[in-house]
Amino acid sequence: MSLRGPMKRSHLRQVSAASLDSLSTSRSLEASHHDAPSDHPSTPDERAIRLSFPGLERRQCTLWVHDETFSREEILFNQTAFSDTGVSAGDVVEILHARHTADGAHSLKADLGSKSLRDSHAKSSSTLHLDALSKFKTPLQSRCLFVVKPLPQDIKTRHPKLELSVTTSIANIFGFKNRDTVYVSIVDRAQCSASHVDIAFRDQYVVRSDMWRLVMSELADKIVYKGQKIVFMGSIKATVKNIFIRGEKVLSGYFSPQTIPVFRSESAKYVLFIQMSREMWDFDSEGTGDILFSRVINGFLPELFKRWANSDARHLVTIVLFTRVEYDASTIGMSSTLSPESLKNIFNSNHAPTRDFYRVVVNDMASGHWTTILDELKKDFRTFLRDVSTLKVDDAPVAKANGSASAPNARPAVIAGRPSTALRGNILEAIHLASSHLAYDHIDRDMVHTGTSIIVITPGSGVFEVSYESLASTTEALTNRGIAIDLVCLSPMPLHSVPLFKYREPPRRPSTSSFGDIQHGGYSPEMRHSFASLANRTPHLSPKSAIQDSFPGIGLRDSWSTRPQEWNYGIPHWLDISYWNPDTYREARRILKNDPNAPIPFTVTKRSKIFVPRVRMYEIQMMGVMESEQSNISIPYLLEGQSLSRGPSPGLSLSPASLAAPGKPSSRRSSNFRHQLSDSLRPEPFLQNMENPKDVILAKSKKTPNSVLSWMDKYDEKVFQPFPKQRQRRRSPKQKRPSEPNVQVSGAHDRISARSISHLRQHETSGPRPAVRKVEPSFPTPKSPSSAKSASPKKPALKTKSTTKVPRISRTISFALRGLSSTPPRAVASTEVNVEHATGKSSTDTFPDSKSVDSLSVSDSASTRTVIEVSKPPGTPQKPVQSSAITPSRPISIRPAPKLPEEPEQPNRSLAASFSTTATEIPLTEDTRSAAQLRKRGPKFEVTMDPGSRDGQIKSPQSKALAPWVRSINPCNTPREVLRDTTWFGRWQHAYPRPPHVAVVKWKSLKSPAILPLTTEEFPTATELATEYLQTPYRVFPNDDTEGVEAPKTRGVLLREMISLRLSHGFQIVVGKNVVEVSGQYSLQSPNVFDTKGLERDGATVFLSKGKSIHRLICVEGAEIEVTRFTHRSSSVLSPERTNGCTVYTAAMRTILNPVYEIKEIKLDSTTEEYNWNYADNYVAGHRDYLYNPAQQLQFWRVRYVLIPMHLRRNIQSFNEDNEEEIHLLGIDHLTHIWQRHKYVPPEEKRFDTSNKKREQNPLNIMYQTRNPSEVVAAELDRILLTDPGLDSSPAQLLPESELLERSSISLSSLAQIIQGDNGVRMMDRRWHWRLHYNCFIGFELTTWLLQNFRDIDTREEAVEFGDQLMKHGLFQHVEKRHNFRDGNYFYQISSEYRVARPESRNSWFPQIRTEKSTPSTPAGDHSKESPVVGHARSDSVDDTPVQTPTTPSKSKNKATIMLSKSMKYDVDPRKRSNRPEVVDLHYDRLHNPDNCFHLELSWMNTTAKLIEDTVLSWASTAEKFGLKLVQVPIAEACAIDQTQPFRKPYRVQLKVPPPKAPAPTFFNPVSFAQQGAPDQHYFQKALLRKFDFVLDFEARSAFPADVEVSYSWGIPDYRYSQYIHRSGSLLAQITDEGDILLLANRLVSTRSAASRDIPRHERMDRPDQYRARAATYDPGDRMSPRLSPVARPVHDMASPLSPQGHPPLDSANLYRAPEHILSGIVEFCSDAEKLEQFYDESLARPASTKVGPAPATLMDSSIPSLELPASVVSHHISPPPILPSRGPQGSTTVPSVDLRSQVRDDSALPRGSPRAGPRASPLSSGLRPLRLG
């Protein structure tokens, strides 16, 4: 059970008070958030509810319970029994159990149907929530609803007393029992309409367009109930999980037009990011004492996995550890693996040199293996910190100062970095990386899992400091791809709004300043941070003078803009935050386990929690109990609403001139103050004991004008008076507060007591506070030599008379003491001072430069700096201001300060701080002291008069661009109503039935992520749409002349298809008030998006939105649809400038099997490729002539499959005496017949095809060859017709209609003449493996010829029967005399008595050039005009990398073009379960080598994915009966995987011993068999792959001749290396140009195998020893279908044999490890020099083709078995030659042929007709050769 039980109830009680009130009360919060537009109100309060019906009163009746044998109807209702009530068909009736009447406060009466009484029941029964099992005990929640239907007449006749009956499943859900007494009454649809319905599904891929169709078909205007099973089109299955009415969970509800469906996937892909920041190794001092990582590994993750297991979820899990490491500048210069070049993108104004690290722990592992996942995580955690903190120094010679090079010196690795804090981590980059593969979501579509969820686990508190560019890029990417993030924080929740991103806007124009010196120099991060905030916070001060005078040697070439360096705060709508509290869930777990000592829920009064200060400052943590009790750490109020860029205001004003005088050089600080620094946080202010504390702060200079100093002294005396006087001032009325000067000279502050701040709050909270105030002095102020803006509230009372202050040592203080309420918190004692081991150095040095008054304090807290901005009127004398290095701790203000009037063109802001919880330990040097003072100019909030309001004023184009997705707020004073605003959640608004609570873990989202809702209310106003968007209109109309295309025929169907297409691409249907206003001219009301009829009327308007793009579809007259695209003008502002359209991100990545981190440059493209919607809409409408490759142009969904030949069991091999190859080909032939049978034919064409049924033939026309496609193309290049127009023609030549034959009137001799004539069957010399068969034909062609040329033969079966009779009469015979006549790739020869002498042999499978009909010059002499068949394969040649040229040069100098695959339209819905055509493009090979993979590719645009999955599942089941395994593989090659999936990379294996020179291959043709070719440079690598049971998948482009343009129906092949696949389908391999082997796990097959948990383990295959694999052979997906749906199970089990080591076949439990097991065997073999040497010798002594598949060996034609398909080795009519050339170690050894032939005959253990004899060369050989030499 979920832990939600006891915790949820308290959550429910918080929300249910309003929602269970009378329906006449104000609209509930939830309804106002999520319900539909104003014209269609979704709550009963806004509708006209029928309060009186003729039959509204409740009626008592007896309920029956029936099963499916009684009736399939869920509810049977006899209207005759209730005739007096006026109930009619279509009314909604509720069934209420009688027990509710006894529990309620009112007794049942005849008129209990009124809503007020019904709700009184709800309220009176609210106490039932106390029961742990009473979730649905109120009548509102537990009632059963149904729509009245007429009772079937037969049931009414047989059971006249039946009043009401429900099925057993309904009775179980609602607690009904047979013969129960229930009460029935009519209810209004408005009163029982559900606001949200949660729908869950698993083990299937469902696109959002299918969800929309499911709702329209199965849910709209119907009653839904919890646990209801939904079946759509007999294939898509889903379950109703929850139903909400006005925020309450109920058992049943009415699905109204305004109900929002929320789909959740229980088989999703989860990417878990664990931020390994510095805090992850911090100890939990207040809890168990463990480090925070223990909370992850022992708390959160086990809880998450248990909840997955309890809900039977089947997710795929990827876990990545990530962190950002900060380096010392001194380590960057050393020669290391992290060179300065690789650190080029990590310098910025706020950070030290950093590098981002990613460690992939597991990738796409099934969630059921959670123990393995945790073990891997623990293992990687042990070494993670060591790996990322050390730099390995290169062994390269180090250049000396004199230029000479020293000898190589191996230097050890050094610890050069440390992880950054969570605040400054690389969280946005990690999220962007995880979502980057979604840009290719349409390629290699996983048909089992739906949805991707990213969970980020951070030790922080939900505050992150990011760059604007990263925030904008990530926001755009997530918005475009429709994905949301779950953030789980391990630290306690702060008291401000979260999640929070703080960022600085980029400059309006490129800056050319020399600020890079600060960025790249030796300054500390804190100093650079302060530098960045200097100039913009002194707008009236010359930036040049300020920087140059304060820091000599640093100049600015150009002025900084005012805006860019100010902090802004935003909350993204795509981030859902949770806080993990182990104590809470530990208590909940005790309750669920019925612990007798656990407290009873809701019966124990909770003790008031004492505020515990979350302090990380070392000095405070080390204080004793008495010290901390006696200390008064007082908290002044936060400043808010103050603008730092306004003009002068009454009070202090200093001119820039007064701060520009140069000073003396500074000296070192004296050491005696260093010891006093740690005392700065103790109660006694030690500066009181100094003789003249002012001298510590202001060191006098001779050039300092006395007027300024004296004025400041007088001002200090007035402002910082002794404590009693100041306290008295605090008691003055609040109205005096605005008149006090808003200048905070923090150098003179001291502590105030808790009592004083309490008094302060009492007075300040009394009376209303004006929103706008004018600041004036409240006491006489001396004549100011300068003026300054008011920038801070009144200072708290001082505890002593000291006018100086010791600087605080804190580097970063979080002021997260403020909740979301506008009422100031009453905490008195402590603040959160989060500083890690902050140190300070005391000194009496003075700064030589004049500074602002603000610089008097060294308090540089990143959280609570107060800033003063100064300006100088003309004529003000200059006075250098000198500073001390030490001031006492200054209290923190957390009360909202009064807002000041803002000037025009200046934003209204308040001061804020960085929400840092920790900070880097940095020594205080001369420069850092200055930086610390300047850092006091704290960040500013993006605040308006309505904080957090979306409609608030936007201050810059950058903020405006981010505004819809990242809301700029004041995190410390965000009104509750703003957080409750449903528009806060953006595109995910409709996924929340109730406003989520931040403090709890969102288990629902973590267990089953919600898919992007179908609807949204995010929409601009009419004015914004007209002024801020660019419009692009066009019109679409259905194509009346589609010519066989499955195009819609009506406007309504076209509109639905266009909406479906947009939904599948991430668009949402817009509903709400704004849409009604905008579309007023076309429609008077918001359309019912689930009503198909309403969408078809003239003028119907539908708006869809996705990010910044909006589409409007209008049904106009003339059967047309007008489409208007709206594109936001600021889209270009949101995206930063990119290189080649994307951002290049450099990071150190370590994938699963990689031993070290490798630097990778990753292109992060946030913008999706511009989709041509005009083309797409017209393509849907049937206009398709203008697209040359629609699959790529319109981003079709694409998947690729391969049929892998498996080793067969003996009982299958003995079937009809067919050998393994023949059985495989039979399987492909069987599949082709299925494809032909379900080929899509438009309805109008079917009428014409019915009369021509006998004319149809198998259009696939696959040509089978025993050579790889590249070899066939190279051999036949001189005979290929350039355009190859005859490939699609029928191999049989039709006779004229008048010459058609009849079986009864034909003789054998005449038939023999016709068959061998010009209009007969093609006769040619055909080669199969190494034997050439002369003048033969194949059975498939003769079958087709007979079918088309005989009037009385109508089916292929009749043709086969007739052909068998001809064969029995001796017209022809099988070349091996083994088979009777068959329809397939079987070779037959005309008998000698009927054979006609032929002048030539037609032996090319390509259309022959008539001038070249002589003897073929290449070995492919067994080809015909038949079409080539390598359709979908990417690369099928393992053979020879160098291209083999034909014997005779080609006479054609033009580049030949050949198509190696063909496509067809395939109907995946032959049973017509869908209301539309369900068609896919099926691409298949036309040239196939039986020992290689047969390739298929499916592409579709708007087809139901579940139907495609079911279709492929049936193919897999059929193929496995014939020893073929259907496996999904990636479309791209293995070496390119990291371009689309950044967390994956092929594993490179190098041979420890370089292979020797490969032997030269020998080619054969009918004339010569001794022609030598170029040696294959990868001969031994291919043999090695064959040894480890790999077969060829796809050939590289370079394997084909350079003068041949090879293309496929799906596009041009682009493989760099040839690719091979393991027979298990779990591992891909490629051989690089250097001879290395790249290995990559095929996770597409593993996901499907893992889902087939219920498929039993299969017995191992019983094979003779000579068929055993030599190396470890794993078949983890043993006889499992490529889809993991258990619907269809294979009939036969074609498993790989056990390895010699005895490893059993892998089941689904360890399927994830299958690729690693195979890889480990290969690595071990390649690392063993002795085994490699032995392998090289054996390969040379036993020459065989290096193909993964059959290859021509060094044999004569006469010594090769004559096979129709691969057949037994038998004698041939051609005598063997005397000797056989063989490649020995030196390529010169010859072996007598008689010995070889004796080995060939040694096949007694094999079935007759085996294609190969003797032991296999390897498990991969798949019968590569008939002989085994040596």
From Swiss-Prot:
Residues 16-29, 668-679, 907-920 have a biased composition (Polar residues). It is a peripheral membrane protein. Residues 1317-1392 form the DEP domain. One of its GO terms (molecular function) is GTPase activator activity. Residues 1-12, 726-736 have a biased composition (Basic residues). GO terms for cellular component: GATOR1 complex; vacuolar membrane. It comes from the Eukaryota. One of its GO terms (biological process) is positive regulation of autophagy. It is found in: Vacuole membrane. PROSITE patterns: DEP (PS50186). Residues 646-665, 784-805, 849-863, 1440-1450, 1815-1830 have a biased composition (Low complexity). Residues 1-47, 646-689, 720-810, 822-960, 1407-1456, 1774-1830 are annotated as: Disordered. Residues 30-47 have a biased composition (Basic and acidic residues). Keywords: Membrane, Vacuole. CDD domains: DEP_DEPDC5-like. It holds the Pfam family IML1_N_fung. PANTHER family: DEP DOMAIN CONTAINING PROTEIN 5, GATOR COMPLEX PROTEIN DEPDC5. Belongs to the IML1 family. This is Vacuolar membrane-associated protein iml1. It comes from Aspergillus terreus (strain NIH 2624 / FGSC A1156). The gene is iml1.
